[in-house]
Amino acid sequence: MRSEQPLYNKRLFSDIIDKSTHFKEGLGLDKQKYLLDEVKRIEDLKRYEYEAYNNGFRYIAGIDEAGRGPIAGPVMAAAVILSRDFFCPGINDSKKLTALKRSKLAAEIKKQAISWSVAAVFPSYLDKVNILNATREAMLLAVKNLSPRPEFLLIDAVQLPDIDIKQYPLIKGDSLSVSIAAASILAKVERDRVMEAFDSLYPGYGFSRHKGYATREHLQSLLRLGTCALHRVSFEPVKSMVLGARYGEQPALFE
């Protein structure tokens, strides 16, 4: 599957403008221009979706993950099926958005989506199967919870084994596909909420601030408190810290 040029659907392009509540009489010219530019940008982000539609697929799911890099917390994946006329101004790769913007967009994506699902794999299992396999399992769980069942998958970089649905892994897909961008936002927002909830269950680590990433604050709390059930013991420096504790050694986290 390859798409180099935007595959605009002119009828849908016009319908979005005509039907959108954003285009009400009296809207300022600057806002109108912004929204028109967003229509064009988002239609361009649908190029892979349109190619799949043109090949006879009706339900196309975008899939992405959040939380592969942290040393604590689950890896989470989201799967989203959007309609052909989906329009959500501001949608983009979640990494390019503020937390507040992501939260607002997530609510709108859930409102407009045909179906959406989020799944998680926690460290107790992640450490047994490795982060790549844990990511795949979270993605598979998210896909299986969609209804209707998707007929085609657009996935950010990862190939999913053991699933009888046609798929296309797209490098940097969260910047190239509107469906993957939507999934990236949902996965990130839901994971952040999970880590904020765990902050009260495991006080002192600062999970609500760093979300499990290896910040200096987090590493200092590890030295002070030791590990908790959320920490990934297969990830460094947690692995060395756990091994050091077993043999009476103190890891040098800041060398």
Curated annotation (Swiss-Prot):
Keywords noted in UniProt: Cytoplasm, Endonuclease, Hydrolase, Manganese, Metal-binding, Nuclease
Principal subcellular localization: cytoplasm
PROSITE patterns: RNASE_H_2
CDD domains (alphabetical): RNase_HII_bacteria_HII_like
Subcellular location as annotated: Cytoplasm
Keyword Lipid metabolism among UniProt keywords: no
Top EC group: hydrolase
Free-text remark on how the cofactor is bound: Manganese or magnesium. Binds 1 divalent metal ion per monomer in the absence of substrate. May bind a second metal ion after substrate binding.
GO terms, molecular function: manganese ion binding; RNA binding; RNA-DNA hybrid ribonuclease activity
Domain RNase H type-2: 58-247
Cofactor(s) annotated in UniProt: Mn(2+); Mg(2+)
EC nos: 3.1.26.4
Gene3D superfamilies reported in the protein's UniProt record: Ribonuclease H-like superfamily/Ribonuclease H
Keyword Hydrolase found: yes
Pfam families cross-referenced by the UniProt entry: RNase_HII
Assigned GO CC terms: cytoplasm; ribonuclease H2 complex
UniProt-annotated binding residues for a divalent metal cation: D64, E65, D156
One GO term (biological process): mismatch repair
Reactions accelerated catalytically: Endonucleolytic cleavage to 5'-phosphomonoester
Family assignment from sequence similarity: Belongs to the RNase HII family.
HAMAP family: RNase_HII_B
Function: Endonuclease that specifically degrades the RNA of RNA-DNA hybrids.
Protein name, as recorded: Ribonuclease HII
Source species of the chain: Syntrophomonas wolfei subsp. wolfei (strain DSM 2245B / Goettingen)
Gene name linked to the record: rnhB
